[in-house]
C-alpha cells in the first residue's frame, strides 16, 4: 500500500539519484536505497479524513465505560465540621489568641457537643440507621498531623469509641454491616449527608442543636468569650469577610480523601456572609444546649469591659479622649459595667443577649447626645463657640464637632466605597468547586475554566493590577495622624466648649435631650428592634449611627436599638434618684429631661 502511494512520485533521490520511494508511518517520503527522508508528505483526501475520524469516534464511544463514582473515606458530617473547626482554631491562634483555644477550650466544647447529640462518646448512636466500617488497613498507614492535635477519641474514654492513626472516629465493631453491605449514599459523599439535611430542629428523641457552618462561628465565639480574648464578635465576622478565618468555601480545607458532593454541598457551601445577631443567638443557644458553666467574669481589666471597649472605639472614631470619663459615668449609673451583668451564664435562659461591642458604641452615642444634643441645631452652635475659642486661645485646642464631621465624613465615604467594591469583587467560588453529581462535574469544570479565561482576558484589557493577596489583620480600620491634613487627629482636644468650667464636677451646657422612643414597647411581635427610618431622626444622629454601624459591620437598627435600651436604663435610674432626693437639692451630674 505504501509503495502504491509512492509510485506517483518520480523525482530522483538527491542523495543516491535513484527512484525508489516509500512512505513511512508518519506520512513522510523516504528512499528505500539510502534511507534519506525528504520534506514531501503524503496527500490525503478530505473525505478520507472525515470518514476515518468518524470511525475513530464511534469506536472510542463504543469502548468507553462509565466512570465509577469517586470514593474516598466513608466519613460523617461531624468529621467534616471537625476539620473546619481545627482550621478556624489555627486561624485564631495566628491572630494572636492563646493556644488553649484549640486543644483545651474548643476541643472540650466539641466533645461535649458530640456526646450531647449522641454522635460520639456513647455506646449506640441513636440517629444512624446505617453504620459503615472503614478499611482499617488502608487508613492506618496515613497519619494526619492536624487531627492528632485535635483527636476526639482518647484512651480515657471507655464507651466504645476510639481514635485511629489518622485521627478520625473509629466506631465500635458490633452491629456494623460488612463491607459488602455498606450503603454509602450515592447522593452525597458522606454517610449521613442526606439524613443531616432532612433532619428537623426538634426531631425526637433528641431535641438537639443542628450543626451548620454558622454554628462553627458560634463555637469560636464561645471559645473567645471563655478566654476573654481581645476579639469581639464584630471583629470575628470582619475577619471572616477578609478571609483570615475559614468560613466561605471552607470545604477546600478538607482532606482529599473526604469527597464532598450531592447533599454535602448544601451543608458546607455558604452563599452569604454571617449576620451578627444570628451568630450571637446561635452562640447563646449552643451554650445552653451544652450545659456550660458560668463563664469567667468580665472585670474592668478585661477587653470586653465597657470602659476598655469605649476607649477603643473613641480612638477608632477619632473622638476626644475626655469622652471616656463620661462613658464610664453613664455605664456606672446604668449598671452596665457590673461584672454580674457582663458575665455570660448559659444557665440563665431569660438573660438578654450581651452585645459587648454594640453596647460600647451605644454608650458613646448617648454621651454625644447628652453633650451635643445631635438635633441638627445645638451641635452646630456649640461648634461655632468652639471655633471662636480656638481663635482666641491657641495653646489648647478645643474640640470642634463641625471640623470633626468634615474630616471623618470624608474618610468614612472613601472607606464605604472601598468596602462596596470589595463586596463586588468578593469571590464566592473556590478553587475546588462543589458538584451535586458526577454527571455535572465535567460541565462545572468546563464552566470554571471558561470563566477563568474570560476573567484573565478582561483583567488584561482593563489593565487591572494583579492581586497581591489579602492584607494583614488589624483591629482598627482608620489611621488618624497629625501630619496628614486630610486625617487630623482629635484625640487630645478639650471639651471646654460644651462644659461649664466653673462647676465641680463639670456639667454640660446643653440642657435638652430627645429620646429615641417615647414609649417602651412591651410586645415581641412588632419587631421594633429591626426597624430604623432615617427620615425620622436628625441627620447628625444618623451619621453617628452609620459611622459606628460601618465600624462594626452591623445594621443600623442594631445600633439604634441598643441606644434606646441604654437610654431606658439611664433615665429610669435618674427618675428613681429624683424620687429619693429632696426637691431643693439640684442634680450636679446631668440636666433633667424637660417635661412634655
UniProtKB/Swiss-Prot annotation:
Task: Name a single GO biological process.
Answer: RNA polymerase I preinitiation complex assembly
As one GO molecular function, the record gives:
RNA polymerase I core promoter sequence-specific DNA binding
High-level lineage: Eukaryota, Metazoa, Chordata, Craniata, Vertebrata
Tell me the protein's name.
Answer: TATA box-binding protein-associated factor RNA polymerase I subunit B
Q: Does the keyword Zinc apply?
A: yes
Q: Where is this region: Disordered?
A: 575-596
Q: Does the keyword Cell membrane apply?
A: no
Q: Annotated region B-linker: where?
A: 70-74
Q: Which residues bind Zn(2+)?
A: 13, 16, 31, 34
Positions of RRN7-type zinc fingers: 4-39
- What organism is recorded for this protein? Xenopus tropicalis
**Source species, domain of life:** Eukaryota
